[in-house]
Amino acid sequence: YGVALLSRQKPIFVQKGFPTDSDDAQRRFIHARYDFNGKYIDVLNGYFPQGENRKHETKFPMKRKFYADLTDYILQLKAENRSMILMGDMNIAPLDFDIGISEDSVKRWLKNGTCSFLPEEREWYQALLATDLHDTYRALYADGQALSWFDYRSKGFDDEPKRGLRIDHILMTPDLADKL
């Protein structure tokens, strides 16, 4: 499902998927631990389910479960006082200025239950932040608008201003903030 970690340094631990995953689960998540001169840093990378639409019988519940499993997993790591970086295609635009599509499109997406900035999705993202993870982009650019996804069919990347969403994120624990 497109999840990988590349590093010059060999990890001391690798977990593919969540420990609670069933044998037939999609492995959309990888966790590696690195030793940097006695400082352990856990790097978690995911290709989060897109969810399609809140009415979809399998994709939306899969996204909800993924976020619940991830939040539980992070809380377990936090209980061990782990330094963490969580990154990936999270498929959620958490704030209004992370949305770079027309107001009419926003209204249509919300009315139709299209995923990316539904209220419940934003709650799932906020649950990650509530574990004391911080949005690195927002730490550097509090009011900035940078988009990471563009619909290739409508060529939103060709327009000025560009049309898309910020759905790719890097979150980290506060003890790593000086590394930004």
What are these model-predicted stretches?
Residues 66-163, 167:
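Metal-dependent phosphoesterases centered on the DNase I-like endonuclease/exonuclease/phosphatase
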Residues 11, 48-53, 91-93, 141-143, ...:
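Short, solvent-exposed loop/turn segments at secondary-structure junctions
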Residues 1-55:
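Structured beta-strand-rich core segments of catalytic domains in phosphoester-bond hydrolases
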Residues 3, 29, 46-49, 63-66, ...:
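Long, contiguous hydrophobic alpha-helical segments, chiefly transmembrane helices and signal peptides
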Residues 1-14, 143-144, 157-179:
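Conserved beta strand-loop-helix elements of the APE1-like EEP
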Residues 15, 94-96, 180:
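Activation segment
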Residues 19-20, 48-67, 108-113:
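Surface-exposed cleft-lining segments at the edges of enzyme active sites
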